[in-house]
Amino acid sequence: RQRQMCIRDRYLTGYEDININDIKNFRQIASKTAGHPEFGHIQGIETTTGPLGQGLATGVGMAIAERILSTKWGKNLINHKTYILAGDGCLMEGISQEAITLAGKHKLSNLIVLWDNNGITIDGDISKSCVTNQIDRFKSSNWSTFECNGHDPEEIDFTISKAKKSNLPSFISCKTIIGFGSPNKAGTAGVHGSPLGDEEIKIVRELFDWDHKPFDIPQ
């Protein structure tokens, strides 16, 4: 989901080297709209995050860079936050623990991780491969932790505002349902990296009263 947002947003924000046909070919062989964003394929992608966990580690590096620049040039000039959207797979990789520990050690209060906590991997329920309590894991690594409804924009915004006040890096567990709105596939691995299918799309469109044509972008 994070990677879909990344590719889609490049198109919606006007990058000229990506068009609607590229969007239609998302995650297809030889398509430049790869399943995992890769540096050099399209404009606006600054780093490859395909190996799960690498994006998290890269984000920690960016937060450290901000801290160094802020110390050198002053907070009036350099004072931004680094945000990371992470999935279950990102947190299962070994590289994530090294990055999490480093961020906690240096109290990177300019870093906020939003975890898409849906409990599903491409192989099925997360319990098949992981029993980690992620909240406890981050707490023990010197992070502030928060929880919110990942389908409620106002609650997410409120939780982020609390995280911004912390003097530690922040981890927000956003509880979500993968494939939200799909009556037959929501909450299953059937929507992890796979199309809904024509029949399910038809049902979802009816549920959301969505009468626009496929790939139409309402103004």
Language model region names:
Residues 4, 19-23, 108, 131, ...:
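Alpha-helix initiation and N-capping motif
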